[in-house]
């Protein structure tokens, strides 16, 4: 993208997204919000498409969004926002003002610096202990947002905090892995060759035992371009079955994760 300061310039920049298009569709997943009484940070993934009927042209895209909020006179307002374009498909002429991401070959000399650097911009850095006052289900669901962000941004330090020391899982295509050290090491090597990743997903079900401090959740993997049935029902290309343990109030870690490919809609989702 590009840098803009001031309300009017930011609004004008967003208006360009529709300037050459008849249709603009965007959906958001992987939501996170954390903060205090007057300041907060947020992140989410966005995917969608821009279309031009007269050209029968379409541009598909996936983005990572993070930013900060301030509360003034009882109203929360956007203070800053970073938008990184992860991937695009289709007719680039519909968004010539966008700064395209590196190609499938990865970074090359002359490429611009990335918009988001997780080690500096991850929303969990500003308020590492900001969630105890929210319902436990939100804290549990947030674990997937943190996990997917860390993996997709190749932030292994943040990813390590997502897992308990005794964690294990069936991580396709790597297989069964036991122990946080082996999990993070395997993910680091698996992630290294890929110029980008983006794991869009919805948390579908959570069951927790507050007294024991354990939980289980089902997460549906969203596939942009095939995310809904014809009648609008959410559609998923795979699911995660995850078990978690509370480390301290408001913070949960994964103890087990397994990834299972296979299409299903929201009405027939796997259950905990």
Locate predicted features.
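A solvent-exposed, acidic/Ser-Thr-rich amphipathic alpha-helical stretch
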Residues: 1-48, 156-225
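Short, cysteine-centered beta-strand-loop-beta hairpins and adjacent loop/turn segments enriched
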Residues: 49-59, 223-234, 264
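Short, solvent-exposed loop/turn segments that connect beta-strands within catalytic domains
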Residues: 54-56, 73-75, 211-214, 228-231, ...
């Amino acid at each position: 993208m590009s840098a803009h300061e001031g309300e009017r310039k930011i609004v004008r920049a967003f208006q360009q997204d529709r300037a050459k298009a008849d249709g603009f569709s965007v959906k958001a997943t992987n939501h996170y919000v954390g903060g205090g009484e007057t300041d907060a940070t947020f992140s989410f993934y966005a995917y969608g498409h821009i279309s031009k009927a007269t050209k029968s042209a379409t541009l598909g895209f996936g983005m990572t969004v993070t930013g900060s909020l301030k509360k003034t006179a009882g109203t929360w307002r956007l203070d800053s926002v970073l938008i990184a374009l992860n991937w695009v498909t289709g007719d680039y002429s519909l968004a010539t003002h966008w700064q395209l991401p590196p190609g499938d070959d990865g970074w090359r000399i002359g490429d611009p610096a990335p918009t988001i650097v997780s080690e500096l911009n991850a929303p969990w850095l500003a308020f590492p202990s900001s969630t105890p006052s929210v319902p436990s289900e939100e804290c549990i669901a947030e674990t997937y947002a943190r996990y997917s962000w860390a993996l997709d941004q190749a932030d292994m330090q943040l990813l390590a905090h997502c897992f308990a020391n005794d964690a294990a899982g069936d991580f396709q295509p790597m297989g069964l892995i036991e122990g946080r050290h082996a999990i993070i090491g395997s993910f680091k090597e698996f992630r290294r060759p890929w110029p980008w990743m983006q794991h869009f997903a919805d948390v579908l079900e959570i069951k927790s035992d507050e007294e024991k401090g354990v939980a289980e959740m089902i997460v549906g993997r969203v596939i942009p371009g095939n995310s809904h049935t014809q009648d609008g029902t959410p559609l998923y290309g795979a699911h995660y079955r995850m078990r978690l343990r509370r480390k301290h109030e408001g913070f949960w870690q994964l103890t087990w994760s397994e990834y299972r490919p296979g299409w299903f809609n929201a009405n027939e989702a796997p259950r905990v």
